[in-house]
Amino acid sequence: MMSEPGAGLDRQCDGLTWRFRVRVTPKAKKASVGGLHDGALKVSVHTVPEDGKANKAVIASLAKWLRVSKGRVAIVAGETSRLKTIVVEFKSQDEMNTADAKLKKELS
């Protein structure tokens, strides 16, 4: 697994898989993905953090933002915390390159 700075985001890449941290703001007025907080991608969702609703919203937001299906985005650590570890599995190198370009553009 190699480390990728990716425009300031603390991200590890292994083949077609990314692992990175997100900092979640639940009950936000505006849902958004973008910006950094201590090396973690900031994700804001409208949903309240109860019964996994905010986690589902985080997965949906990230999947839409990265243009992958929700089934290929998973929270692997921090399910009850604002700081979560996310794994994204891409189908192809082209799909990963497209997401990487978007990430670098949004965070630069």
UniProtKB/Swiss-Prot annotation:
Disulphide-bonded residues: none
Superkingdom of origin: Bacteria
HAMAP family the record matches: UPF0235
Protein's name in the database: UPF0235 protein RB8260
Family assignment from sequence similarity: Belongs to the UPF0235 family.
InterPro entries, per database record: DUF167, YggU-like_sf
Gene Ontology annotations for the cellular component aspect, listed alphabetically: cytoplasm
PANTHER family for the chain: UPF0235 PROTEIN C15ORF40
